[in-house]
Regions:
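A subset of solvent-exposed loop/turn segments in beta-rich extracellular surface proteins, enriched
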Residues: 1-166, 210-215, 269, 311-313, ...
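Short secondary-structure boundary micro-motifs
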Residues: 6-7, 163-164, 173, 219-221, ...
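Secondary-structure transition into beta-strands, especially the periplasmic turns and strand N-termini
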Residues: 25-32, 121-132, 182-191, 240-245, ...
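Extended, compositionally biased low-complexity polar/Lys-Gly-rich tracts
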Residues: 103-123, 130-136, 140, 172-183, ...
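Loop-centered beta-sheet repeat module
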Residues: 139-209
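Outer membrane beta-barrel transmembrane domains
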Residues: 188-193, 199-341
């Protein structure tokens, strides 16, 4: 991740585990689903400000320093309001530092989620069936945040220690989703609105005392609060008459923001097949693109093995060079198990 930050100016990691349980009964006339999910994410990026630099002024200050007797030369040489040089004649070296409010910002979250969903058949006819449902999600979040000005970094190891030992703040919230699904013989259409109530969570404070820029201060204050944006999700699927082949499309009608502050709005297209094989009962291929934020596109492939193991992997089409090696900008990997009892 640090190598990615070096090349791209930011780095991000995400990990999740999910355990859904479907209770197949007709209590209150529908189906109940209970799930537990854990996810963690972290990101480091630069908060940059333009450096004020006048070449003629810097040249004059440097010349004045050279014209001063060595014994009277100051240890620090500011060549602009934002740049300070530290000459080390004994080591034949010159150190450079930026003194404006450009910073490195790190954020991380750990989320435990409990969800309870209920769906029921609202209408049935010759052309298909309409299902309605709702879901409540209880979130327990641990949030951490650190911001350090580049000019205040004197020891990179101390900085990484501070990042690793950042304090977490605990926060809780409840989200509500509603949805509708129309199912026919050869197709289905669905719509879901997530986080209708838009629950909010608060990151810890960061030390604003060293900051002078109003823009940097306002950004860090606004960045303290994370809101789960309301989002409309649409989906559609078509099937062959024997349901061995299928195609699926999913579309987020608007963008939303994740805890790291990145926007996402996914468009997904996939196709799948099923067989009578016990070893490999189904397979799938897919394409997904983030229409907001990073604008990254992914291609993926997945299989179901032994009728209960789901394995999927996806890779971004865009690449980045790290230490001379070309790598995809993003990789997704998923391993799941489905068991009925």
């Amino acid at each position: 991740m640090l190598a990615l930050i070096k090349e791209e100016g930011y780095g991000k990691a995400w990990l999740a585990a999910d355990a859904p349980f479907v209770i197949d009964n007709n209590y209150l006339g529908g189906t109940w689903t209970f799930g537990v999910n854990w996810s963690g994410s972290s990101k480091a990026y630069g908060l940059t400000q333009a450096i004020e630099f006048d070449k003629d002024e810097a040249s004059q200050r440097l010349q004045d320093w050279l014209d001063t007797l060595p014994i009277n030369r100051p240890a620090l040489l500011p060549i602009s309001n934002d740049i300070v040089l530290t000459p080390q004649p004994g080591q034949n070296a010159l150190f450079f530092s930026v003194t404006n409010d450009s910073s490195i910002v790190t954020k991380s979250t750990q989320t435990t989620e409990f969800d309870l969903a209920y769906s029921f058949p609202a209408w049935s006819g010759d052309t298909g069936n309409l299902y309605l449902g709702a879901e409540a999600r209880l979130y327990f979040m641990r949030l951490s945040r650190l911001s350090v000005r580049f000019g205040d970094v004197t020891d990179s190891e101390e900085l990484f220690d501070a990042i690793r030992h950042s304090e977490f703040r605990n926060d809780e919230g409840v989200g509500v989703d509603v949805g509708a699904l129309w199912v026919s013989d050869n197709y289905q259409l669905g719509a879901q609105i997530t986080n209708i109530n838009e629950p909010g969570f608060v990151f810890p404070d960061v030390n604003l005392e060293p900051y002078k820029s109003e823009g940097a201060i306002n950004f860090l204050l606004a960045d303290q609060r994370y809101t789960m944006d309301r989002q409309l999700k649409l989906e559609g699927s078509i099937f062959t008459s024997d349901r061995r082949w299928s195609a699926h499309v999913g579309y987020d009608a608007d963008s939303a923001t994740d805890p790291m502050g990145d926007q996402f709005q996914w468009l997904t297209v996939s196709g799948g097949f099923t067989t009578d094989s016990w070893w490999l009962p189904s397979g799938r291929i897919g394409y997904r693109q983030n229409l907001a934020g990073t604008k990254l596109s992914y291609v993926g492939i997945g299989v179901t093995a032994f009728k209960f193991v789901n394995l999927d992997i996806a890779s971004a089409l865009d690449t980045v060079r790290i230490d001379g090696t070309t790598l995809p900008q993003g990789v997704m990997f998923s391993l799941g198990f489905q068991i009925a009892w």
